[in-house]
């Protein structure tokens, strides 16, 4: 006789900016929600939210810091009507991850921290592709804060703004592919993170 325990989890994915007010709108929010639902274990509940009074994208240290308080306030608001077991911060910069963990009593996952640690399990070195050269130092600092300097092969920039990545997919894929070749062949990375 074997028994199975099924855990129900309620997971919130919070985009720390105003995605619905941007060029990709509600359609992108729903696309992410569908992906997360497809990837999650049944009978988990996954809901994607954004921050209506947040910026349209996070492409600098200033925008990252400016996103934290509105995002924390938004998650606080959501907890008033949702029973949350865990949350995912929907930005590779993990803006305010420590603040979120301080403010809430459920696990908060940062995609950069999580993917960097996962990359270390998949290979010896990883690289990060970020959006602008101006963000190279931010990404390197983040790797350092997570204690993974010795696993970092490189940080390179695609130099396409977040809100334009999906505008011309051929251009984005060609630039991404060219960077990936350099990362593998010149930097000797085993894994590549898109951030």
Annotate each PLM feature:
Residues 9-29, 126-129:
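Short beta-strand segments enriched in small/hydrophobic residues
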Residues 14, 84-91, 188-195:
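Periplasmic-binding protein-like
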Residues 31-44:
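A short, Lys/Arg-enriched amphipathic alpha-helix followed by its capping loop at the start of a domain
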Residues 49-69, 163-169:
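N-terminal beta-loop-helix "entrance" segment that forms/cooperates
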Residues 60-77, 171-179:
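Glycine-rich, highly charged phosphate/nucleotide-binding loops
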Residues 67-99, 103:
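Beta-alpha junction/loop-to-helix N-cap segments that form part of ligand/metal-binding clefts
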Residues 101-122:
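Short, acidic/small-residue loops that bind anionic groups at enzyme active sites
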Residues 142-195:
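Active-site rim beta-loop-alpha module in soluble metabolic enzymes
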């Amino acid at each position: 006789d074997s028994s199975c325990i099924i855990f129900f989890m309620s997971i919130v994915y919070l985009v720390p900016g105003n995605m619905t007010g941007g060029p990709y709108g509600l359609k992108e929010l729903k696309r992410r929600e569908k992906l997360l639902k497809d990837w999650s274990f049944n009978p988990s509940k996954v809901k994607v939210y954004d921050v209506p009074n947040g910026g349209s994208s996070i492409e600098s240290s200033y925008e990252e810091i400016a996103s934290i308080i509105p995002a924390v306030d938004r998650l606080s608001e959501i907890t008033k009507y949702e029973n949350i077991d865990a949350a995912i911060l929907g930005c590779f910069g993990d803006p305010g991850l420590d603040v979120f963990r301080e403010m809430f009593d459920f696990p908060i996952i940062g995609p950069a921290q999580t993917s960097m640690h996962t990359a270390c399990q998949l290979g010896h070195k990883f690289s990060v592709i970020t959006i602008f050269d101006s963000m190279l130092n931010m990404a390197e600092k983040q790797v350092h804060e997570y204690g993974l300097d010795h696993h970092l092969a490189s940080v390179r920039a695609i130099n396409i703004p977040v809100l334009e990545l999906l505008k011309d997919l051929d251009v984005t894929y060609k630039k991404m592919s060219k960077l990936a070749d350099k990362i593998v062949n010149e930097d000797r990375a085993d894994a590549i993170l898109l951030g």
